[in-house]
């Protein structure tokens, strides 16, 4: 029974789509979140606190609320659609945008904490050695913040795989286009196909355990932030 579910053509397509979404989202989150985390970690100020609050908002905001407003923003009559010339709702690109916004705090916050834990001294030393700010960032800050980057990448990937409310609101669960594993589990439960739901839910439960274990091992080895 289990093999029949896992190796079903439709299930393999759903699995591939889910992994593709999580991978693309994680790459974009690291590319966008790392410089944002660096900026937030350098000093304070009202604007930085406002941006930090906006970044962390998806942690407490119900996914359906975020998904609802994203659906409106991506709809056919929205200013964003007029600007782009095409709508993002019910498309893979729309899922990526929604996933990046929804998972942003799970990537930015660990990286920001790693930069803060590093302190200003390593960058000051690099400056005395005549390293440019950009060189110092790539050769000093990023290596020392590696544990935060790893934790952020793991959290971002796992959180994207487990998304439900946002992806359902934005994507609608179209097979082969926007239907991911979490939506598939919901469909199985609605149709009373408990065996199939158990297989997928059990797999995601095991993945969540591995993610948390990996984070704990990283923190145990490197501490909560970067190496001193």
From Swiss-Prot:
* ABC transmembrane type-1 domain boundaries: 15-217
Instruction: State any single GO MF term.
Output: molybdate ion transmembrane transporter activity
Extract the CDD domains matched here. TM_PBP2 (cd06261)
The places in or outside the cell where this protein is found are: Cell inner membrane
Task: List, alphabetically, the Pfam families matched.
Answer: BPD_transp_1
Q: Which residues cross the membrane?
A: 21-41, 54-74, 88-108, 133-153, 154-174, 198-218
Main localization is membrane
| Keyword Lipoprotein attached | no
Q: Which UniProt keywords apply?
A: Cell inner membrane, Cell membrane, Membrane, Molybdenum, Transmembrane, Transmembrane helix, Transport
Membrane topology category: Multi-pass membrane protein
Gene Ontology CC terms: plasma membrane
Q: Which InterPro entries match?
A: MetI-like, MetI-like_sf, ModB_ABC
- Which protein family is named in the record? Belongs to the binding-protein-dependent transport system permease family. CysTW subfamily.
Known partners and oligomeric status? Homodimer.
Q: What does this protein's UniProt record list under function?
A: Part of the binding-protein-dependent transport system for molybdenum; probably responsible for the translocation of the substrate across the membrane.
Q: What is this protein called?
A: Molybdenum transport system permease protein ModB
What organism is the protein native to?
Rhodobacter capsulatus (Rhodopseudomonas capsulata)
At the highest ranks, the source species' classification is:
Bacteria, Pseudomonadati, Pseudomonadota, Alphaproteobacteria, Rhodobacterales
| Name of the gene encoding the protein in the UniProt record | modB
């Amino acid at each position: 029974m289990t093999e029949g579910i896992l190796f079903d053509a439709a299930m393999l397509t759903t699995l591939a789509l889910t992994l593709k979404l999580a991978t693309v989202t994680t790459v974009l989150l690291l590319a966008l979140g790392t410089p944002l985390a660096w900026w937030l970690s350098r000093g304070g100020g009202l604007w930085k606190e406002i941006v930090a609050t906006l970044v962390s908002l998806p942690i407490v905001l119900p996914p359906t609320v975020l998904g609802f407003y994203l659906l409106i923003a991506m709809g056919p009559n929205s200013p964003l659609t007029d600007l782009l010339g095409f709508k993002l709702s019910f498309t893979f690109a729309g899922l990526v945008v929604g996933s990046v916004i929804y998972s942003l705090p799970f990537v930015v916050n660990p990286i920001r904490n790693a930069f803060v834990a590093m302190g200003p001294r390593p960058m000051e030393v690099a400056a005395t050695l005549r390293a440019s700010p950009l060189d110092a960032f790539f050769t000093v800050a990023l290596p020392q913040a590696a544990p935060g980057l790893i934790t952020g990448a793991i959290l971002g990937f796992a959180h994207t795989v487990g998304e439900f409310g946002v992806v359902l609101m934005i994507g609608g669960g179209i097979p082969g286009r926007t239907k991911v594993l979490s939506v598939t589990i919901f469909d199985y439960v609605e149709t009373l196909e408990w065996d199939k739901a158990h297989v997928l839910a059990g797999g995601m439960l095991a993945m969540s355990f591995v993610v948390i274990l990996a984070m704990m091992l990283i923190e145990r080895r490197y501490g909560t932030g970067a190496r001193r």
